[in-house]
Amino acid sequence: MKGYFNNEQANKDSFSGDWFRTGDVVVTDEDGDIFIVDRIKDMIKVKGYQVSPTELESEIRLAPGVADVAVIGVPHPQAGEAPRAFIVPSSEDVSVESVQEFLSGRLAKYKQLTGGIVIMESLPKSPTGKVLRKELRAL
């Protein structure tokens, strides 16, 4: 790959030697297979720790009565950012308190939803089904 045409700054920001920085966060399994698990731009920076929204969403989906969820980072005066969850319930029994109680022993303290929990009827999504996090940030 030769780079961006007439845009040296984009080349400096996007390339490291012959490697292109995609912004993807990946893991490698014991067989050497690579899996994309998140995006760097979506990572939440809490007190110097990188928190994966995907990891939090996976845990929240295990809570009884949760149909769908999205997590974003919101500004926090002491932590820099804090995770906030937007939850679509599958039953009327879901509450902010029930989700917090479910997560209390499952997540490290810095991964707790100190940015809050918002119960919604549906998440904003693109025509392809991708959560529109930008719209959630605007709420």
Go through the PLM ranges and name each one:
Residues 2-3, 10-13, 17, 25-111, ...:
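AMP-binding/adenylate-forming catalytic core of the ANL superfamily
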Residues 108-130:
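AMP-binding/adenylate-forming catalytic domain of the ANL superfamily
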